[in-house]
Amino acid sequence: MKLGVVGLGQAGGKIVDALLEYDQRTNCHIVHDALTVNTATADLNALEHIPADARVLIGKSQVGGQGVGGDNELGATITTEDITEIQHVIDTISVHEIDAFLLVAALGGGTGSGALPVVGRHLKQLYTEPVYGLGILPSTNEGGLYSLNAARSLQTAVRELDNLLIFDNDAHRQANESLTGGYAAINRELATRLGVLFGAGDIDTGTANPESVVDASEIINTLKGGGVSTLGYASQSLEEEDGAEAAGLLSRFKRESSTDSAGGTNRITSLVRRATLGRLTLPVEPANVSIDRGLVIVAGPSDCLNRKGIERGRTWVEEQTGCLSIRGGDYPLPESNTVAVVVLFSGISGADRLHELRSIGSEAQTTGAERTGSSDRHLESILGDDADELDSLF
């Protein structure tokens, strides 16, 4: 699946930078084009993989390259006023060659949080390709302003985007990890998950069974319908499993002779369970939330893609979620020494983390100033019954 990727703000730019590094290192070629947008010159200069001519500085006359200081209303205003500058770079993308846009932003900051729904709305007005978002939730200890920014940005972005994938920093930072090191590790982990998910939709069917391989339409159909999504991931190194001394030809022979074995089936079903019940990007208990659609992707060497295991894993996910719209398939990676599983849940309602975010944001908004707002039933199902207490960004 080919993506036009847009990083918005500091965190969005860094994640797109990490995704480009992953794309180049693994040759998965999911990033057809990438650009980043920011109001801070220093953040743009710190990037390593995004080309210099694809780094767009906006708000020069308003903030002079110094950023918006966490003010996402100002971020949204500047993005709206300077949307033509962003479009000049988007015009260099061969949009007819991509399957979707992916916008990436931290929801708690200023530039990315404000720009996400603005750019999403703009792209949907101009193009027929789906426009997806990846929104990073702030940590709960970052304070009420960040939660308010995130709640308002999320509420607006859900309305403007075709789907919003959520990543919760709190669920993925390791204890005693430095802030810089923690976010760098998170960005690499995110890039891997996105690489497996969207890479699965860009496979040469000449090297894979067309009955089981996942294509771009499967991913698009899973994300169709809007709302928010979460992504689970688990992997198993084949060298670790077989022992270092059994790697190479002997390891491959053993795998080929047991493609349909109970061991191959159990490996996949175990990974599906770990991906589903482990660290989802938006932490939820699948049995305790409403899920509209889902997708199970198993990636690895073709001789390890056990059909029985994939089907059993997909069926187990159906049973756990109560959702009957769970797709399943494989992603052949001939040179890989790892079997990995990605589980995508889309159209989620009732997530405790989002209700908590809305509650903190509402409290911060009430404390800061008296506001009025509105919301529709769809937003209430995502953010909770009190979603109308929050103002959208526009």
Curated annotation (Swiss-Prot):
One of its GO terms (cellular component) is cell division site. It comes from the Archaea. One of its GO terms (biological process) is cell division. Gene3D superfamilies: Tubulin/FtsZ, C-terminal domain, Tubulin/FtsZ, GTPase domain. Disulfide bonds: none annotated. Belongs to the CetZ family. This is Tubulin-like protein CetZ4.
